[in-house]
A protein has these predicted regions:
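Structural motif
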Residues: 62, 104-106
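Alpha-helix capping/helix-boundary segments
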Residues: 68-69, 114
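Gly/Ser/Thr-rich loops at beta-strand to alpha-helix junctions
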Residues: 110-116
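Active-site-proximal beta-strand/loop segments in catalytic clefts of secreted hydrolases
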Residues: 66-67, 85-86, 108-110
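Rhodanese-like catalytic fold shared by cysteine-dependent sulfurtransferases
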Residues: 4-49, 73-104, 116-176
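Short hydrophobic beta-strand that contains or immediately precedes a catalytic carboxylate
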Residues: 51, 62-67
Length: 176
């Protein structure tokens, strides 16, 4: 089953790459966001502004970064916890149940592909442990960075984001 899912994911990425084409115009990342929202309409997508507001108001949010350890080391959103995007639902409940209970759970990755898949897969598990809601950060860390929001690495302010690869790097604004 996982092989089949990985193959479908690869086909989706190839199709998206052909559809989006070169990064040009005012906001090519928006096309990726819109495509994800349409393909995964069972997952709620929240924008960086909404998440930033919740974090500023100290609302209880369980924030999970679904990128690789290497990507997370370079920078992440303050307060985020790295979680493997292939984590089984039972392991997620055991490892993060206390943290997620009574909170809104937000997943993010570079642009939203991995985090949307995980949010969709873990929605039921999160509800079972008492999470208030589950959402994907629309545009992921790339949009967060492009809007010049706070990033950290090892407890210090960070300015750069791991580009994932050359294809996805074109969706990042250069660090100021």
């Amino acid at each position: 089953m996982m092989g089949s899912m990985a193959f479908r994911f690869l086909l989706w990425l190839v199709g998206l790459g052909a559809w989006v084409g070169p990064a040009s115009g005012p906001n090519p990342l928006r096309l990726v966001e819109e495509d994800l929202a349409q393909r995964c309409d069972r997952v709620r997508h929240c924008g960086p502004g909404e998440l930033a507001q919740r974090l500023l108001q100290l609302e209880p949010v369980a924030l999970f970064d679904t990128r690789s350890a290497q990507e997370f080391e370079i920078s992440h959103i303050p307060g985020a916890i790295r979680v493997d995007p292939s984590i089984p639902a039972g392991e997620f409940r055991r490892s993060f149940g206390d943290l997620a209970a009574g909170r809104d759970v937000v997943f993010y990755c570079s642009v939203g592909v991995r985090s949307t898949a995980l949010a969709q897969r873990l929605q039921n598990a999160a509800c079972v442990i008492g999470a208030k809601s589950v959402c994907n950060l629309s545009g992921g860390l790339f949009r967060w960075h492009n809007e010049e929001r706070a990033l950290v690495s090892h407890g210090r302010s960070a300015k750069t984001v791991h580009p994932f690869d050359d294809y996805w790097a074109r969706f990042l604004k250069p660090a100021a």
